[in-house]
Structure formats: structure tokens, C-alpha cells
Amino acid sequence: NIVQHTRLLMSQAKLSIIPVLEKAKKIMKGTNTKIVFENIYMMEEQKDCTVINLCEYLNSENMKVCIDMCHLYCQAHIYKKNIEEFLEKYLDKEKCKRQVYQIHFAYTANEDGYIDRRTHAIMHPDQETLNYDANLLCEYGMKDCNWVTEVSEKDYKTREDEANEIKMLSEYIEKNNI
């Protein structure tokens, strides 16, 4: 799998990357290869997720979406919206069910949209907070996706935060029969 951060609006993609992706789509058809486009937070993207729209347009089993939970929070904070209000405008449940293949799962502790290693993509502080975020993603049809913890560490030698995040996520999955 190839994960690609994509900073294009659909109007730009149609003029640039879509012709290339259409060729790649033909080459990859019938293979297990996936190109996974990750959402990023763009100022132009207030009410639609461009990478979901891109994958809807391409309509290929080989080209899917990765939703990064931290990017959702950063974008909501930039627009001064709570996460539920933002997701209601940004994500379409049916499109998510069809197009989201993978989730980058971690916590964001700041409320300004700024990426700081100490506050962005960190371990959830507790099981309740993790459950809240996981429930949001499941509500939008993403429970059957690949969930990848993506945690910044204080100490990359021990990976203690990552291990704790995986433990809490495993408890959530077991409790909710996912």
C-alpha cells in the first residue's frame, strides 16, 4: 500500500493528477495494490473531504482513503467548530463506508489546529476519551477499516505510549465486538 497526503481540490485534481490516476487504475485493476489518499487539513476544505470525493470519482477498489483523526481535529479547531459539528459537514457516512480503507488513530490535545509534537498525534489520555473518538469514526461507517495507531512518543526506544494506545484500542474493540 502507498499512503499519499493529497493537497488538491477536485477542480485542481481534474486538471493534474486524475489523468495519471486513471492510467494507474487500469494498471492496478485485479491486483491487491492500493493507493491510499490521506486527508489533510486545508483552509479550502470546510464542507467536503477532497480525498473521499477523489476516490468516489475514480471508483476503484485500488484507490481508497485514509482518515487521520488528528487532521480532523486540527481542521475542526481551525474553523472553531466542535468535532461533531465539523464532521457533519465534512464527512458523508455512505461515502466513508465505500471509500475509507484505513484510519490513523491518535489524540489531539490542543484546540488551535497547530501541530506540535507534544499535543498532536499523541496517546489518548484515558479510555473514555479514546472511546469517544472511536465511536465518532464508527458512527461514520469506519468500524471495519484498518485502524493504525499513529502516536508521537516521548521515548521512541520504549514505544510505551503506542503500546498503551493499542491496549486501550484493543479494549474498545473487544467491548464493542468490532
Give the positions of each predicted feature.
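Active-site acidic/histidine proton-transfer and metal-coordination neighborhood
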Residues: 1-64
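Histidine-acidic metal/acid-base catalytic patches
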Residues: 19, 55, 60-67, 73-178
